[in-house]
Amino acid sequence: MPTYFDQLERVRYEGPKTTNLLAFRHYNPDELVAGKRMEDHLRFAACYWHTFCWNGSDMFGVGAFERPWQQAGDALSLAKRKADVAFEFFHKLNVPYYCFHDVDVSPEGASLKEYLNNFAQMVEVLAQKQQESGVKLLWGTANCFTHPRYGAGAATNPDPEVFSWAATQVVTAMNATHQLGGENYVLWGGREGYETLLNTDLRQEREQLGRFMQMVVEHKHKTGFRGTLLIEPKPQEPTKHQYDYDAATVYGFLKQFGLEKEIKLNIEANHATLAGHSFHHEIASAIALGLFGSVDANRGDPQLGWDTDQFPNSVEENALVMYEILKAGGFTTGGLNFDAKVRRQSTDKYDLFYGHIGAMDTMALSLKVAAKMLEEGELDKRVARRYAGWNGELGQQILKGQMTLAELAQYAEQHNLAPQHQSGHQEQLENLVNYYLFDK
């Protein structure tokens, strides 16, 4: 079979001084960082949708890319050709994982019967590709937002028949993920929200969404799927407001429906931007809430109000993200999936490699900076000193519920408390982080 990327054998590590733009400068899969191989820390994945499904179209222009599998022809044959190219790409890029939506890998067809038949055939193709290449599935998911039937949502749709169709897609995609050895299953509610409150029953839709998630959890346990269920927060787009706005919002939703022990979060950098948060904030929040699962590594443009899905290129931003992840013990079933796409003007097929190589080097360098910060512990020491009072007798009595509000007021009066503000040393801490970032 002829290869698509015929000018490249494989992307390899050549070190910081290489001038080869199709080589890694910082990502060395076998390099030990904090006692673990870099590949095992980062758990990179390439996504099917942006890389092989997007044709370069946007709101103002038609497709700009010439991809052989996007031409007219038999849909199933073209899907198999796309799989050939995808796994050639995964292998040559040297990523251990990939991710997909159901209709990324398989044509939806004109009926539910066609959808099920096509997807079943393509799961067999993917299983064979995985066996041949050694590339594994980080997570699968179902696209319940693109088809016109989902104009008013899937789980939150006012029509229970649409809800049922979505359930069919999700159960089928979950089963496929299980069959393919996927380590997680992602739920992203692209249209689980509203565009106007004039035709929306918020309580009804929230109850529907909660029941849908409960059924997903029930199915997971019934089938014996041992992977992690993940919700991916996003505040808006394509709807005006989504119910999974950010990490904190999802936590409240999960608590309401008794799911906080069953579902974790897949945090995307660009979605944090849209929610008015930093990527660092959303990662730290997910960890603090006990919900951290996986990451969609990309970046947004703070000057634009939509999901640009650019490749991550800031070590300054991602070093702090990796610091939080390492401090929390690192990934378990999750990883760093590049939910990112080349720009519409990047029409050379090798631009797909340039985008991913730069992103992988960025995250590798971020990992090394984070590991050094964690090893030396200077940031942790300063934070610990700031909260040291809570380890004392008074702090512990408060936290353990041994004092009431009135007793605290009495304590303050009896001891004539006159606490003085202590500096937060923000500038010092920012300088400290820069020391690790730019230490040569």
UniProtKB/Swiss-Prot annotation:
Active site residues according to the UniProt entry: H101, D104
Stored PROSITE patterns: XYLOSE_ISOMERASE
Binding, Mg(2+) 1: E232, E268, D296, D339
Enzyme Commission designation: 5.3.1.5
UniProt cofactor note: Binds 2 magnesium ions per subunit.
Localization: Cytoplasm
Binding site for Mg(2+) 2: E268, H271, D307, D309
Catalytic activity of the protein: alpha-D-xylose = alpha-D-xylulofuranose
Cofactor: Mg(2+)
GO BP annotations, alphabetical order: D-xylose metabolic process
Membrane-spanning residues: none
Recorded GO CC terms: cytoplasm
Top EC category: isomerase
GO molecular-function term, one example from the UniProt record: xylose isomerase activity
UniProt xrefs under HAMAP family: Xylose_isom_A
Entries under PANTHER family matching the protein: PTHR48408, XYLOSE ISOMERASE
Subunit architecture: Homotetramer.
Sequence similarity: Belongs to the xylose isomerase family.
Protein name: Xylose isomerase
